[in-house]
């Protein structure tokens, strides 16, 4: 089985990771851990003014943070016997997850129900809602915290 795991620093992402460890067979499962780094804009940009990107150093720092998060997740999965890979991609997490599921020919895409933004939609977060609608494979949304 090929699984794509959407991962960030939210408790729901950790719950999704733990779901894999509890429910999948390591010898039969390849997990690709995906985290996306949005290119942020300054909070002070005027509505009609062009967005001002953050300095490269800040984007690199955020990218390193995502890489460290994914490395810890990878270590946990490998200790449990899973074959893993990591992708930290620039851009929107919704598109990064759907595209990775497509290119990796995933059988299952797993995400937590809400990400680190803490801005819930009606039932699911915006990333979960998007991947449920657009992923080329089955999607598991983990709601229960580990």
For the regions a language model picked out, list residue spans one by one.
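General small-molecule cofactor/ligand-binding pocket signal
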Residues: 32-34, 85-89, 140
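A short acidic, glycine-rich active-site loop
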Residues: 52-68
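Structural beta-alpha unit
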Residues: 75-109, 146
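Glycine-rich, Arg-bearing micro-motifs that act as flexible, cationic patches
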Residues: 108-133
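Short secondary-structure boundary segments
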Residues: 35, 112-114, 144
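Small/aliphatic-rich secondary-structure junction motif
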Residues: 1-54, 82
